[in-house]
Amino acid sequence: MFGIMAVLLGSGDAFHLVPRAVALCTTGLENFTVQLGLGKWITSVTMTIFYVVLYHIWRERYQIKGYKAATAAIYSLAGLRIVLCMMPQNAWLSADAPLSWGIYRNIPFALMGLIIIVLFYKSAKENNDSSFRWMWLTIVLSFAFYIPVVLLADVIPMIGMLMIPKTCAYVWTVLIGYKAMKKEIA
């Protein structure tokens, strides 16, 4: 499952980070509005799926049975986020996309993240799981870098560069899983 997460991360963020890097190194963000908007749209969906996969990793790792409410919450929030991402009011390809829709679509995403942070924190602690002891922190860091971008990137464009350490936090997430899997197979 961490392989799926790596592909989701790489493909989703490539659509967002590559145009941003090219824009900042060439003619500026204003000349890459469509590419940046499309990249944000794609990465919004892929990262939602990333969290659903991460939830299933938690269930598998800790042999979770039941927890129907948590499963329903994760899937409902993911579905709501994807529906909100598809709404034309997002104006993804426009230079003046409304901040309000950036906030609306990120509320279910943040709630998904919060649920998964709590689940991994509690489970790693209860199971004395040294391999996954920092999984919760990778998610906290990813949101700590992501939230300022959502709220301030239109006013302070360079803040969009926080997407790079956000991606590094996600890479750390995948590495934690890969190293644990490699260790358990050996």
Identify the role of each PLM range.
Residues 1-2, 58-70, 95-98, 122-134, ...:
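Membrane-interface helix-boundary motifs at transmembrane edges
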Residues 4-22, 79-81, 137-150:
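Hydrophobic alpha-helical transmembrane segments of multi-pass membrane proteins
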Residues 15-32, 37-71, 83-85, 120, ...:
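Internal transmembrane alpha-helix with an interfacial aromatic "cap," most often the third helix
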Residues 28-40, 94-107, 156-168:
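Non-cytosolic membrane-interface motifs at loop->transmembrane helix junctions
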Residues 52-58, 83-88, 107-133, 145-152, ...:
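Alpha-helical transmembrane segments in multipass membrane proteins, preferentially the mid-helix core
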Residues 71-74, 95-113, 129-136, 163:
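A loop-to-helix transmembrane entry motif
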Residues 76-103, 120-124:
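Membrane-helix boundary elements
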Residues 136-182:
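Terminal transmembrane helical module of multi-pass membrane proteins
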